[in-house]
């Protein structure tokens, strides 16, 4: 809870869940990384979409001033951050807008239902909001972590008017069978607050599909190394890399970037980071290095409660 410091002195390196099975640490050089020490995430107090009128637009405000500007259609390429996640040298997650990549196209909740199969992971997205993840369990319903409780909802209700998509292919772990994914999700319906083992909807949904404890609170021990890397694509030829002690920490930073949006992330990096010379033989990617001691800022849109590990 809070700023607790974990006692690791009695553990050997072999007890660390993500240790290299060969026993060889390929990352012995100096490392710069970030690690969250606060305890709760985000989306349950996220700003809600404005009420919609019968034509899908906003309701009139009844004032005498000019009507508010019409909201622009949601475009993932404008609002979302293209990024990859690595555990050591293995890519375990990738969000790419490369030509021919249709997986990030979004659909209305009604159209999304036609694309879902039991066991699918669904992501609802909207500008300036945290992505909300859910597990489709069939019969037009999803199971998701919402307001510190795992609940079963109709997909259209869980969307809260946001567009969505199936995101089975973002994480590159081997998935469980569809029936096992549905079983995992349904088994935790009703769990809430201190019974929870996940900080956010993404970690819960991903755990249901892949069954990896790295998605759980405290699923990995922090031993001072940063084996996880979040590579943010700045442009076609430049990227910036942040390193993390755990997948849990990395997901929180990735979700913060999704919430503030691509333009804000690029502006933040331009303001706080300084370009470094590309390494020899690595001319296609310019790397940037965070100033010493710069952790990612916690989001102002945190949950109003805590989830704890068991």
UniProtKB/Swiss-Prot annotation:
<protein>
    <recommendedName>
        <fullName>Protein LRATD2</fullName>
    </recommendedName>
</protein>
<feature type="compositionally biased region" description="Pro residues">
    <location>
        <begin position="65"/>
        <end position="74"/>
    </location>
</feature>
<feature type="compositionally biased region" description="Acidic residues">
    <location>
        <begin position="300"/>
        <end position="310"/>
    </location>
</feature>
<feature type="region of interest" description="Disordered">
    <location>
        <begin position="274"/>
        <end position="310"/>
    </location>
</feature>
<dbReference type="InterPro" id="IPR007053">
    <property type="entry name" value="LRAT_dom"/>
</dbReference>
<feature type="domain" description="LRAT">
    <location>
        <begin position="122"/>
        <end position="217"/>
    </location>
</feature>
<comment type="similarity">
    <text>Belongs to the LRATD family.</text>
</comment>
<dbReference type="GO" id="GO:0005886">
    <property type="term" value="C:plasma membrane"/>
</dbReference>
<dbReference type="GO" id="GO:0005737">
    <property type="term" value="C:cytoplasm"/>
</dbReference>
<feature type="region of interest" description="Disordered">
    <location>
        <begin position="1"/>
        <end position="76"/>
    </location>
</feature>
<feature type="compositionally biased region" description="Gly residues">
    <location>
        <begin position="54"/>
        <end position="64"/>
    </location>
</feature>
<dbReference type="InterPro" id="IPR043299">
    <property type="entry name" value="LRATD1_LRATD2"/>
</dbReference>
<dbReference type="Pfam" id="PF04970">
    <property type="entry name" value="LRAT"/>
</dbReference>
<feature type="compositionally biased region" description="Pro residues">
    <location>
        <begin position="289"/>
        <end position="298"/>
    </location>
</feature>
């Amino acid at each position: 809870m809070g700023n607790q410091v974990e006692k690791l002195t009695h553990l050997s390196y072999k007890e660390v869940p993500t240790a290299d099975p060969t026993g060889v640490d390929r990352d012995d050089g100096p490392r710069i990384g970030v690690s969250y020490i606060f305890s709760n995430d985000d989306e349950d107090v996220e700003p809600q979409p404005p009420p919609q009128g019968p034509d899908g637009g906003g309701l009139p405000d009844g004032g005498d001033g000019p009507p508010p500007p019409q909201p622009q259609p949601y475009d993932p390429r404008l609002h979302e951050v293209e990024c990859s996640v690595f555990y050591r040298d293995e890519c375990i997650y990738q969000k790419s807008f490369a030509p021919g990549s249709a997986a990030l196209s979004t659909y209305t909740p009604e159209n999304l239902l036609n694309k879902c199969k039991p066991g699918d992971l669904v992501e609802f997205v909207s500008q300036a909001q945290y992505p909300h993840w859910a597990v489709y369990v069939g019969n037009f319903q999803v199971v998701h972590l919402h307001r510190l409780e795992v609940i079963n909802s109709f997909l259209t209700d869980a969307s809260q008017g946001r567009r969505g998509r199936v995101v089975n292919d973002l994480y590159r772990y081997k998935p469980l069978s569809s029936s096992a994914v549905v079983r995992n999700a349904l088994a935790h319906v009703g769990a809430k607050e201190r019974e929870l083992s996940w900080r956010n909807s993404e970690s819960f949904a991903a755990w249901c599909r892949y069954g990896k404890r790295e998605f759980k609170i405290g699923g990995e021990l922090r031993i001072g190394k940063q084996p996880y890397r979040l590579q943010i694509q700045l442009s076609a030829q430049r990227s910036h890399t942040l390193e993390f002690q755990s997948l849990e920490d990395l997901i929180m930073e990735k979700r913060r970037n999704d919430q503030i949006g691509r333009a804000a992330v690029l502006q933040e990096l331009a303001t706080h980071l300084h370009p470094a010379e590309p390494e020899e033989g690595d001319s296609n990617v310019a790397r940037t290095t965070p100033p010493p001691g710069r952790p990612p800022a916690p989001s102002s849109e945190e949950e109003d409660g805590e989830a704890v590990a068991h």
